[in-house]
Each structure stands twice: as C-alpha cells, then as structure tokens.
Curated annotation (Swiss-Prot):
Bridged cysteine pairs (disulfide): none
Similarity-based family: Belongs to the UPF0507 family.
Official protein name in the record: UPF0507 protein KLLA0D01133g
GO MF entry, a single one: SNARE binding
InterPro entries: Ankyrin_rpt-contain_sf (IPR036770), UPF0507/Ank_repeat_27 (IPR051248), VPS9 (IPR003123), VPS9_dom_sf (IPR037191)
Pfam families: VPS9
Length: 1067
C-alpha cells in the first residue's frame, strides 16, 4: 500500500516524512543517512515557511525545504549511548550537532535555542511547542515516533516576506527584523559632540592646541572670584577654540560649527564652572540663608492662587486636586535638574516644569501670579539645592544672549528668577510659621493627641505634599474621632461635593483610602454619607471612580467585606485596572485575607446577582488577566461555587500553558485539587508546552501527588507517572491499590523480564516496552524525555492494569522486596512435559491452526495499520486547519483599516487539543504491537513445526536404514563357530548397529523434545489467543471507542466554550 499521506501543510515536515519516492528525491542523501537513525527535528512555524522567502538565495522557504543544506540544518541525529557504554545514561544535553555538522545549544530554563559554529549568524530562537510525530512512512525506521520541536523562526536564512505579502509587512513590520528603538534627541546631541571630539583627537596638532587651551582655562577658572570673571574666561575659550578650528580645513566645513563648538566647550568646562560658581554664590543659596527644610510642609492653600477664590461658592476641590497632581508631576521633573550637564538640558527641565504648572484645569487658567506662587510652592516641596547657582549658570553661559532674553526661554528664566527673589526674610518667616502649624496639626492627628480647636478651625483646607486633606490624614491614621468631628462640626468647610471630589496623588477617593488602610469605621462612615446623601448615579460614579492604577472601590472591597451588601450592586464588576484585573479577580487573589473563603463566596454571589440584574450572562473571559489566568487559576480555595456556574472552562490554559489543575499542583492547593478532580469536564492529562509537563510533574509535595492519584485511581487501577532522576537513578512513580511507590527504571525493566518469563506467549508487547524504557532519555532534551515517558507510561498502565486483573502485581512493595519477588528462574518442566511424542496428524493440525490464525491476525494487523494511518492523517490535518485559520487571522489583524483589523483580534485562541488524537494513535499502536507479538509467536511456533518435520524425516530415514540393514534384528552367532573373517565382519556390523541405534535414540529424543516445546507453546498460544480475543473486545470498548469518544466530547465542549467566549469578546 502507498505509505505517504496527503500533502502536509508544513513544507519541512512534508519534505522529510511524506516523500513518495525517497530513492530519487533531492533529499535522498538525507534519507540514506536517517534510514535507521533516531533524530529530532527543529521545525519553524508553518506560517513562516509559507509566507517568507530567503533573500540570499531568492527562494521561497517552502521551496528551500527541499534543499539538503536547509533541511539538514534543522535535523539533529542522536546516537544511543547504551550501544557503546552499557552503564552510560544521557540526562540532559545542552549542545547538539545538526545533520550537516552545525552547532547549536538549547537553553531549557527559558526554552530557547542558540545557534553556534557553522551558522552564518548567532540567533536566539524560542521553542514554542514539543510533540511527537508518529512514523507513517516505510523509509525512516529508527523509531515509531519522531520528536518535533516547533520553533519561532528558521535557524538559517535571511528572511523577508513574499512579494504578495509585502503589504502586510509595511503595515505591521517584518516580525523577524530587528526593531531598533529610535534614539532620543539628547542622545543624538551627545553623539554629535562626542563625534566632534573624536575628529579633533584624530588631528594631533589641533588636539594639542585645544588641550592646552582647556588646561589654561580651567586653571584660570579656579582662580576666578566673580561670575563675570568666569564668564570672561568661558567666552575667551570659545573664541580661541573657534579660531583654532576655523583655520583647519579638515574641521571648518562642518555644519552648525558655532553650536558644535559651544556644546564642545560646555562638555569640557561644565564641571569646573559649576564647582567655582558654587563657591561664589554659596552664601546666596536658599539652603544657606534660611531653614530651607522647614518650608517643605507648605500647603497649596497657603500661597496665593486663583484656585482658592474669596467667594466660597465658586471654590472647586476637584480643580485643586487636579492642580496638586500637576504640581507633583512638575516636582518630579524639577528634581532632575541637577542631573542635567548642559545649558539646554537644565533649561528644558525648567520649561517642562513651567508647562506642567501652567496647564488649564477645569476652565481655570493659570495667571502669572498663580504661576509664580506655584513655583514657590514647588521650590519649597522639592527641596532642590543649588538653585541660585543654576540660575546664574543659565543667565551667563548661554549660546547667545538673545536666546534667554526673549521668547519662551526668557519668560521661563524671568519667572524662575522671580520665584527665587520671593524668598526674603519676611516671606520666609511667614511660610515657616504656616509650615509649623501644618506639621503640628498633622502630627497631632497621626498620634491621636488633642488638637487645638482654634488652630484646627483656621487650617481646615491644608493639604500635605502628598495631596492629602485633613480627612485623608484622619482616615490613614485611624483617627476616626477627629474625622467625625470634622464631618459633624465643619459641614460647610467639608460639603458633600468636597467629600466626593477629595483625592490623593494616586487619585484614590476617601473611601478607597479607608479600605486600603483597613479603616472599617471610616469606610462605614463614608459609605453611609454617600448612600444617604447622593443620587444613585452619583453613588455609581463615586464608587466606580478609578485611581491612578485604574482601580475602583470594588478592587479593595476584600478589606472590608461588610460594605459589600450595601454598595456591591453599584460596582462595575467588569472594570479592569492597569494590570487587566477585574475586582472579582483581585478579590480571588487576596490570599492574605484571614476569612478568604467567606470573602470570595460573598463577592462571587454578589457578582452573579449583578449579572442577573443587568440581564447579562456571567462573562468568564472578561475576568481573565492579560496572562490568560482565569478565575479558576487564581482561586486559592472554595472553587465549588465557581464550578457550579455555566460556561466555566476547567481546562483553559494560561499564556504559559498552565491549566488550573497544574497551578493547584504547583502551589499545593489540595482542597481545589480534590474538588476539580471530581468534575467530569476535567482533562487531567493535559500537557503544558513547551516544557511538556503534566499536573503530576508540577507536584513537589507528596500529599498533593497522593491527592491527584487518589482521584485518578477511581478511573484507572494503575497510574505510572513522573520520570525523575533521583539518587543517580531514573525513577518513576507508580500508584496501585491506593499505595504510591517510587521504583528505579531498571527495576521496571526487571519486572518486564519477569512477565516475559512467566508468560512467554503473552500477546502484550513486553519486549517493545522494554526497548522503549531502555531508550528513554537518549535525546537529551527534557521536554522530549517527558513526552516519550508520558506515552510509554500510558502503555505500561495498560499492561499493568491487565496483569492486575490476572494476578498479583506486588507494586505496593519496597524496591528491594519487589526485586526478590521478581527474581524467579525459568519455570522447570517435568520430563513428561518436556518430552512428548506427537504424531504427524497432530503437527498438521497445529500447523493448520497456526496458519489460519496467522492469516486472520495479519488481516487484523493490516486493518489496524490503515486505521492508525487514518488517525495520523486526522491528527496532522486537524493541526493544519488550525494553523491556516490562525495564519489568516494574523494577516487580517495587520490590515491598515483599524475597523477591519479589530475584527480579527482576540480570536486566535488555541482550539487544538492533541490529547485524544495521541491517545487514539497510541492505543491503536499498542493493539497493533499486541497483534505483532502474537504473529511473532505464531511464526516462531511454525518454525518449530518445520524443525519437527525435519527431525521426523531424519527419524524415518534412520528407521528405514535400520530395517534395511537389520530386517530380523536376530542375535549374532556365537564366537566359537566363527572364523576370523566372520568375526571381523560381525564386529563392523555390530559397531554400525550401535551407531545407528544411538542415532535413532537421539533423533527420537530430539523429536520428543521439540514435540514437548510445540505442545507447551501451542497450548500457551491457544490460551493467549483466547485471552487476546477477550482482551480485544474490552480494549475496543475501553480504549478505542469509549475513552476516545468521551475525551473528544470533552475537548469539543472546551472548543465550543472558547467560541462562545470569543463571540462575547466581540459583542
């Protein structure tokens, strides 16, 4: 039958595995080298191979997949280490050689491949997925499965999109091109100055003169006693450098030469000028004239601005909050002024600071007087030192005098100078007094000490440098007594509007602040005021007002769950913070809460009611975070209530491929494991990619392992899992009859030897499993090892489960005790069992029996081979369909029309589930090899019957010879009557007779011995056939039909759920 499949979508896989004529193919050299070898393939994505071309060769990558060098660069051949050194075992290799001799290394921690010697360039490539491709051709015989490492891009080739796809690359960019970040303007200026300096240094005579000029200038600057003196030296130096450079033809042609010389001189003299200016203006600096630190506590309302009008009715706290935010932004920018080492850099800081302070807020523009006051406030709060030195430098060392006297820069410097001039003794004394009062009030509130009523009443509008009002200070310090006093006795100063508008720099409302510091009493007071005094729309607006982290009140409700009943219905439970977390998600992650189960249950009930009241279905997808974590992933305990909701996806992986069960296994969430394992929708054997780990592989706690295995044991009598290297041995975990034990891999192979001895004609593929166990790990790649062991252990599960139904498994014993039990000799047969005389009619009957069964089982094997190939086709083509769909969506998402591109977003979900396909193929393979084992037994016994006929023929010939030579078999005459000749002849005859007699005896004995073997083997085979027929029917039902159908149904349910979630995302 033809051994190739319909064309595979991935060109590289199709070229290697699906060649109809390997002996005449362009890759025949590769096929001859790979004939009986074990290897793995690094396969770029199908999308890449179909959409890109190699710039150097001009060939499409799909065509390049039929060129030896490209293909061989993606194939790694592995030698079995046990062939040379029996005790050697590969654990994890990191360095590999491709088929054409190129070097690469695999970094398992971050799943990347790094190319090395032999490749034209060093590339770092991500491993996306690892799987095993079943062998379906007849020319690669090294293994039943080939490991496939799916990688993000090819290991070689200069990639550009195909011509017809260039339109997409122009819109979205070549995803394989190096994305260089645009340099900042400041970096560009620095580069120009450094390049200019390098040019000067490359001309020795110019470099010497320039160096001498700077050396002399620096010495004179150190001796200068006035700003004018420093400025004079600086100007003279600029002129000298300009003269030196203008006389040199190699430098005087440069563009913007004056600006370049200015920047260059500044670069060389900036530090010296700053040091000397500090000495000259030291006594004029604010920090030396006054107690500058005492001014830090100044409040915004204590400097004159148009945001605090005399008419209280026109006052807007919302505008003040916005202004405080602008001041804080400007403050952070002003603090960086000392880090700038250029005139333009410092001036840019001041200009940006002015721009931030001058922003129009809620229709209120900032006039000149307000701007000056805000700059004074900024200087007090920022505590930036050396401002007089900065002003002196900016006003005396400019590139041109007109640049700082007119325009925006002139206005900025004049305002800066006016702000510094504001600080004279009278104003400073006044500010200091106000700051002292502020600090006294705040300290009294924070320490819960008595506050002077008069002092408090005259400073009700003060705010800290963090933008906190008195109400906010009371809330954060848990001083609810003063808070109550303020709200009760100063209602006009703290009207409802101000309570609603009050925010700190994080834009958190007073209620959010109360929840953040767990001030339940304050939260209750505030919520009562809001619920009783506001309309429903105002309540919703306030409770859903986001802070700087885009979190609303609901994101903090776990801090005081008692508020939920009264305010829960007003929350927007689908609002997401800057991390993409909804309030429900945030509550589920509040692991430190003492009453966690109570909180999540109440909040979930409230959210379910909220969806019902809004006539909306519960939308699980919107409660996922950007990393793909669902509510099930993050819930620490109590998932019962979540599993009761419709449309919950219990198997959905996050962006790292981790399902909820894997998360529970990793973080020891035992109660969640016990609950979710009872859910019929669970696919407990899902594999994480690209690490290829199951939920059992993630366990580190024996209790967690036992919890999963106890639940699994209800479905499977024997569970084999988790190959790990411990105590210098490969060990596997086996769970049987409620007992978990770890056994070495060598002992399991010893166990299979025991089964082979005890059941020599068993139909189970014991020898195949022994070979698979022996070769585990030779690829040296952890993901491949886990995937190989996963499938091999599933086969061992079936074998041991069957043995468990026929007798004692002994798998609850310790390793040494089990080894003693398994150390049995070959069963001894009695003489009557070993030597049996069979008649030709019996042999004919056995041969007829064997030939009939051989023909029947060969038919069955052919059917299984065809069925397996069809299963492989279905598996591969299913992935091809998913790949094409995702490729289509990817291209659509790059469309230039945003409306069109948006329709392709958020739909590229992983709909492909390989478990049922792999299980179906694996189970068919197990049954096929069981049939092959029986066929081998038939052929072996047929060979013995042929040998029996040979010995039978020899025996008949010997009997014929005996009858011919000794027809009567009478006794010879006595020696007394014989002469010499008669005696000699009779002696020869006697010797011949004895020899023939011995040959007859030996031939008969051999025939009986073979007959005994045939008889015993025939009976064993007959029993084996009957057992296989019984096993086959049950196997069809349990492992071919029922389990696969059940698995496929559950998988399709997940696919449909993802479709529903996707549609919800686009509604």
């Amino acid at each position: 039958m033809p051994y190739h499949l319909p064309v595979l979508l991935n060109p590289l896989l199709n070229a290697i595995f699906n060649c109809p004529s390997p002996k005449t193919s362009s890759l025949k050299q590769m096929f001859s080298r790979l004939d009986d070898e074990r290897f793995f393939i690094l396969v770029p994505s199908t999308e890449t191979l179909l959409q890109f071309q190699d710039l150097e060769s001009g060939l499409e990558l799909a065509e390049l997949c039929y060129h030896y060098d490209f293909v061989a660069s993606h194939i790694v051949v592995i030698k079995d280490p046990t062939k040379d050194v029996p005790d050697q075992r590969s654990i994890y290799n990191t360095d590999f050689t491709t088929l054409n001799g190129r070097k690469l290394s695999i970094r398992y921690r971050n799943s990347t491949i790094v190319t090395g010697d032999g490749f034209t360039e060093r590339r770092k490539i991500t491993i996306k997925e690892i799987n095993l491709l079943p062998t379906f051709n007849d020319y690669l015989k090294g293994s039943n499965y080939t490991p496939i490492l799916h990688i993000s891009m090819p290991l070689c080739g200069d990639l550009v999109p195909l011509d017809e796809l260039q339109v997409f690359s122009k819109v979205a960019g070549n995803k394989y091109s190096k994305q260089e970040q645009a340099p900042l303007p400041f970096d560009e200026e620095q580069k120009k100055v450094l390049y200019f300096e390098q040019r000067i240094q490359s001309i020795s005579d110019v470099a010497e003169r320039v160096a001498l000029t700077f050396h002399l200038t620096k010495a004179r600057i150190k001796k200068a006693i006035s700003v004018i003196g420093i400025r004079t030296e600086w100007l003279n130096t600029r002129d000298s450098i300009r003269q030196i450079i203008s006389l040199d033809k190699r430098l005087n042609h440069l563009e913007d030469l004056d600006a370049m010389i200015y920047d260059y001189v500044e670069l060389k003299l900036f530090t010296d000028i700053q040091q000397q200016l500090s000495e000259i203006v030291e006594d004029q600096e604010l920090e030396h004239r006054f107690d500058f630190k005492a001014l830090r506590s100044i409040s915004l309302n204590q400097v004159p601005t148009n945001f605090y009008p005399k008419d209280e009715k026109s006052f807007s706290l919302a505008s003040v909050v916005e202004l405080e935010k602008s001041v804080n932004d400007a403050l952070e920018y002003l603090k960086s002024i000392d880090l700038k080492t250029t005139h333009s850099g410092k001036l840019e800081v001041l200009s940006t600071t002015m721009r931030l302070l001058s922003r129009e807020i809620n229709g209120i523009s900032t006039d000149a007087d307000t701007l000056l006051s805000l700059f004074v406030l900024l200087i007090c709060r920022s505590q930036v030192t050396g401002l007089v030195r900065t002003l002196t430098y900016l006003t005396n060392f400019e590139i041109s005098e007109t640049s700082i006297k007119f325009g925006l820069q002139g206005y900025v410097l004049s305002t800066f100078e006016a702000a510094l001039s504001f600080f004279h003794q009278d104003t400073v004394d006044s500010l200091t007094k106000k700051c002292a009062s502020n600090k006294k009030i705040w300290a009294s509130i924070q320490k819960h000490s008595k506050v002077e009523a008069e002092l408090l009443s005259s400073n009700l509008r003060i705010r800290t440098d963090s933008g906190e009002s008195l109400l906010s200070i009371c809330i954060q310090s848990h001083n609810n007594e003063v808070l109550t006093t303020l709200l009760a006795n100063f209602e006009s100063e703290f009207p409802l509007e101000d309570i609603l508008d009050d925010r700190d720099f994080a834009l958190s409302t007073l209620l959010i602040q109360a929840l953040q510091v767990q001030n339940s009493q304050a939260a209750a007071i505030l919520s009562e005021i809001i619920l009783k005094s506001c309309t429903e729309s105002e309540v919703r607006s306030y409770l859903n007002s986001p802070n700087l982290h885009n979190r609303i009140t609901a994101h903090y409700i776990m801090q005081d769950i008692s508020l939920l009943e009264s305010v829960g219905r007003y929350f927007n439970w689908e609002h997401k913070d800057i991390n993409g977390h909804t309030p429900l998600f945030a509550v589920f992650r509040s692991y430190d809460a003492v009453n966690y189960d109570e909180i999540v249950t109440k909040v979930l009930d409230q959210v379910v009611k909220w969806y019902a009241n809004n006539n909306k279905p519960f939308n699980f997808k919107i409660h996922e975070d950007p990393k793909g974590n669902t509510l099930l992933h993050v819930m620490k305990s109590g998932i019962e209530s979540l599993l009761k909701l419709p449309d919950v996806n219990v198997n959905k992986p996050d962006s790292k491929g981790l399902t909820p069960l894997m998360i529970y296994s990793r973080y020891n969430r035992i109660t969640n494991i016990e609950t979710i394992m009872k859910d019929e929708r669970l696919l407990c054997d899902l594999v994480q990619q690209p690490l290829v780990m199951t939920s059992l592989d993630f366990t580190k706690n024996p209790k967690v392992t036992k919890t999963i295995l106890d639940a699994t044991f209800n479905r499977e009598p024997v569970v084999i899992h988790s190959l790990r290297f411990e105590e210098r041995k490969w060990k596997i975990g086996i769970f049987s009859e409620g007992i978990f034990k770890k056994y070495s891999l060598d002992l399991i192979q010893y166990y299979l030897r025991y089964l082979k001895i005890m059941y020599p004609c068993s139909f189970h593929p014991v020898q195949l499993l022994t070979n698979e166990l022996r070769l585990l790990g030779i690829y040296g790649v952890p993901g491949v090892l886990r995937l190989q062991s996963y499938h091999t252990f599933k086969k061992l599960d079936m074998l041991f489960s069957y043995v468990n139904t026929r007798g004692k498994l002994w798998l609850g014993k310790d390793e040494e005790e089990l080894k003693v039990l398994l150390d049995v000799p070959t069963p001894y047969l009695s003489e009557s069992e070993r030597f049996i005389k069979l008649e030709p009619e019996e042999i004919n009957g056995i041969q007829t029996f064997l030939k009939y069964n051989l023909a029947e089982f060969q038919k069955l094997r052919n059917c299984l081979i065809i069925l397996k190939k069809l299963a492989i086709v279905q598996q591969i083509k299913h992935r091809d369909v998913i790949t094409m769909r995702n490729s289509f969506l990817s291209l659509g998402n790059q469309m230039s029309q945003k409306g069109v591109a948006k329709s392709f977003e958020n739909t590229n979900c992983a709909w492909s589930y390989d478990l049922s396909y792999y299980e179906f193929t694996r189970n068919l393979e197990y049954l096929e090899h069981s049939v092959v084992t029986l066929l081998n037994n038939f052929e072996s016994l047929l060979a013995k019957t042929t040998l029996w006929w040979k010995h039978f023929g020899e025996l008949m010939e010997l009997k014929k010879e005996w009858k011919k030579n000794f027809p009567n078999d009478k006794a010879p005459p006595s020696s007394a009557n014989r002469n010499f000749i008669d005696t000699y002849i009779e002696g020869k005859r006697s010797k011949f007779r004895n020899k023939l007699s011995n040959q007859l005896k030996m031939s008969s004995l051999n025939l009986k011995k073979i007959g005994g073997e045939i008889k015993t083997t025939h009976e064993s085979i007959a029993v084996g056939i009957n057992l296989f027929i019984e096993f086959k029917e049950q196997f069809y039902h349990d492992h071919i039909v029922k389990s696969i159908v059940d698995q496929r149904i559950r998988e399709n349910k997940q696919i449909m759920q993802q479709l529903i979630d996707t549609m919800k995302g686009h509604v």
